Amino acid sequence: MRIERVDDTTVKLFITYSDIEARGFSREDLWTNRKRGEEFFWSMMDEINEEEDFVVEGPLWIQVHAFEKGVEVTISKSKNEDMMNMSDDDATDQFDEQVQELLAQTLEGEDQLEELFEQRTKEKEAQGSKRQKSSARKNTRTIIVKFNDLEDVINYAYHTNPITTEFEDLLYMVDGTYYYAVHFDSHVDQEVINDSYSQLLEFAYPTDRTEVYLNDYAKIIMSHNVTAQVRRYFPETTE
């Protein structure tokens, strides 16, 4: 514990959490156990009195700042003459109340720090997850086409013969138009993707709509093996 004499009526000390534990107090007990908290602060006052001859006379003003490695405490004697005339019992009671108040304030500060830490941790996790998804998306190739109507979607489902099963697909609808997005795995050959795209264009049309636009404004009708779902729910159309 480091003690600094500011003037005749004020002292400042800084004590690390390891110093607190060395004195037989745990960090949790200090902020959550009233009796242990008072015991700790009175022991500090005894040590301050021994080193700096700072005798407790009358009420004290106490200010506490919690840091990552410890706490800084500023203690000042009151200069108010009326308060200086208080009895020892009244002064002790007021000191105890101030100790409890500063403990509560410091505990609240600790809670706020923990909430801030949790918030930053969640933000970092979200950013990490977003980077992972972005990285995963870079390792895939996506094609998007549009169908004029549901009949074209059904015709494609019954006449297509997927060259590969290594893809994920989504069927969107917005403003009465159907959009079909296919995400190919990174190891699928570009030639296979080109063939699949050519097969799609026999029933659908190119589009400048992006996946971001569709996710924001369109409704997902089907996902995961869309063609199989279409064949399950809709009969083949006859020309």
Curated annotation (Swiss-Prot):
Q: Which Gene3D superfamilies match?
A: 3.30.70.1950
Biological role stated in the UniProt entry: Enables the recognition and targeting of unfolded and aggregated proteins to the ClpC protease or to other proteins involved in proteolysis.
Q: Note the Pfam families from the entry.
A: MecA
Q: Which family does it belong to?
A: Belongs to the MecA family.
Q: What is known of its domains?
A: The N-terminal domain probably binds unfolded/aggregated proteins; the C-terminal domain interacts with ClpC.
Task: Please list where the region (Disordered) is annotated.
Answer: 118-137
Name recorded for this polypeptide: Adapter protein MecA
Please name the HAMAP family in this protein's record. Answer: MecA
Residue ranges annotated as compositionally biased, kind Basic and acidic residues, are: 118-128
GO MF, any single term: protein-macromolecule adaptor activity
Q: Give the highest taxon in the source lineage.
A: Bacteria
Describe its assembly: Homodimer.
